[in-house]
Amino acid sequence: MKLYEQALWFAGVTVEEKRFMSENQSSAPIAENKMGTMPVGKLVFNMSLPMMISMLVQALYNIVDSIFVAKLSENALTAVSLAFPLQTLLIAVATGTGVGMNALLSKSLGERNFKKANKIADNAAFIYAISYIVFLILGFTIVKPFYASQIGNADVEIMNLGIDYLSTVMIFSFGLFTQIFFERLLTSTGRTIFSMTSQLCGAITNIILDPIMIFGLLGFPKMGVTGAAVATVIGQCVAGIVAGTCNHKYNHEVSLSFKGFRPDISLIGHIYAVGIPSIIMQSIGSIMTYSMNRILIEFSSTATAVFGVYFKLQSFFFMPVFGLNNGITPIIAYNYGAQQRKRMIRTIKISLTTAFCLTFIGFLCFEGIPQVLLGMFNASADMLKIGVPALRIIGIHYLIAWFCIIAGTVFQALGKAVFSMIVSIMRQLVVLIPAAYILSKIGGLHVVWWSFPIAEVISFIASMAFLIRIYKTIISKIPEGKL
């Protein structure tokens, strides 16, 4: 399937009504659509805003979750922060599998092979069920060794709090897998508004339940850190129910039927062929946070808590940029296929400007009001002493991170995802972790934080080199076209 045709399906501009569908129906000619005709600025806004809002709300509820946990104690905040690597892995498996499912679904829908599309959805549901069973087992078996590998047995309170939190999240992760499965089905047919709606419902549910479950309000028992986990999984279940309902009512292109179902090993293999690279890409963050926790815990548990707070705050400023990415990917891909260089370049320029503005706000906050940011998490005097310089040092990388993020999106949209993978691995594993380890040995804790700007500078250089290469070999050879 051509790249611009896939982009059309992700954007939902070629989805026809159910009454026109039949298994053997040939595809009608594709008329000019908004991605080739709408003014680029308006198009980027329309395509990106829903995902930006959705991801901003997701980031907000992650922050609110930690703010409430921090009111319990610094140890509680540290325990939740240490859970991040496995939580990241959990999300990576769910979303990466969804990427593989979406790719095959989009191709089958573009070919108007609805029988195959339904079969892909059935097999993807089977994969999600098996994935949940795996994490269910891990939730009972691996959580304690996981915490012990990061902090040893020195701090029993942190370990016990962490085990309660992470076990709950993993054992009841069926809500997360259900949510992402149905949201990806909606996305594959262009119904992103319903995907956003389900995410908002889940996030709002989580935000409302957090204080109730954690502090025992409205007659509920005080559950502490476990309450935060319970609120999270209930929010995921609500999002899954909403997404499933929207699929049943509005997604007429894909239907699920498990009557006489047998797993198709070939289809499952194709789903993973596309999904595993995405899982690996997202899992890099899991390895990075685990390794950083190991380095920082050598100084103090407070240092680990500061790192956890930084990650929550970073998500708030970066998630809207990632939402922008989701919006511009099909625009760039479509206009690449349609040979419209002016529209491609205009899209990239608008995206770079928007991403810079968003991350510059983060830079100003990290440099100007770190005490306020840390104060939201009930920071102790020790946490402020460590956290204020840490946020100011790490915040420097916001000045160039915007470029690396958008460049990675351009690579993926033009079919050069390997460049994104190289830059991501370079930033998070090849440079960041070794730099942090070396700096931890030759200087104090405040020196370790410089590993983040160092890694970003190297990533910036690599991204620039790859982008120049892509411009010379691909973009410059495309006809200018109309704007």
Positions of PLM-derived features:
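Helix-terminus/linker motif at the lipid-water interface of multi-pass membrane proteins
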Residues: 56, 60-78, 147-156, 212-223, ...
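Short runs within selected transmembrane alpha-helices of multi-pass transporters and secretion channels
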Residues: 98, 168-187, 195-203, 228-243, ...
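Interfacial/gating helices of multi-pass transporter permease domains
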Residues: 46, 69-88, 120, 156-161, ...
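Transmembrane helical elements of multi-pass membrane transporters/channels
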Residues: 46-65, 168, 202, 235-239, ...
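Short alpha-helical transmembrane segments in multi-pass integral membrane proteins
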Residues: 2-48, 105-174, 221-276, 332-397, ...
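Hydrophobic transmembrane alpha-helices of multi-pass small-molecule transporters
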Residues: 89-92, 136, 206-211, 240-244, ...
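N-terminal transmembrane alpha-helices
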Residues: 35-67, 71-72, 88-100, 104, ...
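Small-residue-rich hydrophobic transmembrane alpha-helices
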Residues: 77-137, 176-195, 306-364, 368-370, ...
